[in-house]
Amino acid sequence: MATTRDYGLGEFTFPRGWFMVSDAASLREKPLSLRFFGQDLVLYRGKKSGKPALLDAYCPHMGTHLGLNDTSYVVRDDTHIDGDGIRCPYHAWRFGPDGKCDDIPGIKGPIPKAACVRSWPVHESLGAIWAVSYTHLTLPTKRIV
């Protein structure tokens, strides 16, 4: 059992492993805002691949929550989920399932490496979306279910 002290997060304990974060049927066109592992997260299904992706919830540019918005043009124009990425509702930066920013509208040239969010390993099985509670350790190589 890991403690949050092991990760510099305080005194709470949490188990290491895979956890069901959503049933697969709930993951449709809109991203889901979740809180797991002491983090605000956003879960979405890529339109291109159909695969789920789980990212830290806040854009590194201005701190906007990637999943909580119903009024921005990105959401109204149905470009919130763009290909296999998700666009920030504020300035439309697009983050891929690996957490890297791969498009900044109006910017030509290289995208800074710091323009990224943490990506969490996910697996879809048994009608559920599973996420692993640690991102810095080696993942199991065998199927979980």
What are these regions (language model features)?
Residues M1-F14:
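A boundary/linker detector
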Residues P15-R16, G38:
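Short amphipathic alpha-helical segments, especially helix-boundary/capping motifs
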Residues S22-Y134:
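Rieske [2Fe-2S] iron-sulfur-binding domain
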Residues T135-T141:
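Conserved small/polar residues in nucleotide/adenosyl-binding loops
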